[in-house]
Amino acid sequence: MTQTSTAPEAERLDGIVTLRGSTACRQWNGIQYLGGLSGANAGATRLSMNVATIPPGGVAYAHVHVDFEVMLFILEGRVRHRYGEGLGQSLDNGAGDFIYIEPGVPHEVYNLSETEPVVAVVARSDASEWSNIENYPSERRVRDGAP
């Protein structure tokens, strides 16, 4: 996969935009995102979508989505969401599960496998895709020395 900080180029037709077989990816917060569609390449105004991979044993450090919703569909693997005030609640999800995260809910996501990645389709009600996300304090972030 190709590491990129810009959105991959999409094919624009009359009212339909297609991104074919993207190999571009972006690393963020312990997650690898396969290039998808957003305002940057599709002209979307309220939606973005891509595929996220959490490596074996990996973690998406605690963060909050400010003023936008997120829906996920897990294609492969199992995750644990630590969420809520102080990350005091926990929920496990696996392949075939749909997940909805309300705006403003602090959460940290762990890949439960040390040998297999987690792969999920991620849709956001924010076309900017990478804006409006704030770090949230967590013991794991401090222990790992993550930003």
Model-found features: residue ranges?
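Conserved metal-binding segment of the jelly-roll/cupin
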Residues: I54-P55, Y83, N93-L112, R124-S125
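Conserved short histidine dyad/triad with adjacent acidic residue
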Residues: G35, N50-V66
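Short, charged/polar surface micro-motifs in flexible loops or helix N-caps
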Residues: A42-T45, I54-G58, E76-R80, D126-A127
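Histidine-centered active-site/metal-ligand motif
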Residues: H63-H65, H81, H107
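Short strand-connecting beta-turns/loops that link adjacent beta-strands
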Residues: A42, D67, G86, E114-E116
